[in-house]
Amino acid sequence: LRMAKRANGVSQLHGEVSRKMWNSYDGICEITAITNAQNKTYWSDPALDEALKRDDNNAISQRKKELKHKLFRVVANQTGKLFDPNVLTIVWARRFAAYKRANLILSDFNRFLKIARNKKHPIQIIWAGKPYPEDFGAINLFNEIFWKTKDLPNCTVVTGYELWLSGHLKKGSDLWLNNPKLYHEASGTSGMTAAMNASINLSIPDGWVPEFSKHGKNCFLIKTAEDSLPQEEKDKIEAQNLLDLL
């Protein structure tokens, strides 16, 4: 920061947090913010995009079912589990980094099971991603989710997050789950590309999300705990807030 002429965060919140972290140091450059973006031409499904432009709910619903069929073929081929395109489908898919809290929704497992087994309001959940080879904490997290959900027919873990798989997950999901520790996600662009494909963000208001979010209109925001609380307590509170929303 002392050697540079300028620096920027990759979302407005990231810029704000970075200034709080570094502005007490003498001789550093100005820290601004330039929010990351994604290429709509690459990520959006053309037929779905046309339906969204026309505000044609029937066409949107029909195309989403077609895209879910494609995603669920991938899921079936890898896991053997058969998902229903008529059921609300939640996807958590990204790097298995600890701060992203892939297992937050499972924290109160008994309450999670009640939601997962609710026949009146059924859901399906897909986790996808890869931990780094020697990140044993992330590997344990991945394994924990697998073992906790392996006997649930409507929950599964898919290995990988290559571009083609990422595209299927965003196009075939109904809800895109994003629950990092607050102030830890610099930007996080997966929710942008999910939104391009009529997948609603269910998210902590971190990274780029506060610049986009209108709770109950274009997304659902998970209420965050007080900043002053210990992280373990924050995790418990935010897990309950997530389950409340579901």
What are these regions (language model features)?
Residues 1-246:
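Catalytic cores of carbohydrate-active enzymes across secretory and cytosolic contexts
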